[in-house]
């Protein structure tokens, strides 16, 4: 059984969902240590998006989420509007919306092969937004040519409680090493 379980992104998840995950973990392993992890989101240049119309994407497609870090970054940055790209999507991207109807007002991630990049480029250029917020780990601006700036939303793991991950690792190693 696990010694430690990390529940990540607790700062953006619903409290009830985090509690349910915690209950499921302790039901299976009552002695497990649980560490809450956070995912602070930062825009490379928040002033570029403030009070502007933005397109969010490419971002989450699988996993049942209707939005991801880029959407959260947009709402926190006080953008004027998040443009729904569905009306501007080329057929390849429109097919993704049909396959994953849970996707909200975001441009879905579908891959980075040449045809997929071309579909992404055309859809972005068609969408009447001032700027794109991209939360994908890839540097999208280096792969496609678009008629609006691309601002990256970045996130990483952060601890928010004591004991922290290092403390738990020391405890674990002390318990198993002679």
Task: Explain the meaning of each model-derived region.
Residues 32-33, 38, 42-178:
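P-loop NTP-binding site
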Residues 1-32, 36:
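Phosphate/Mg2+-binding loops and adjacent switch elements
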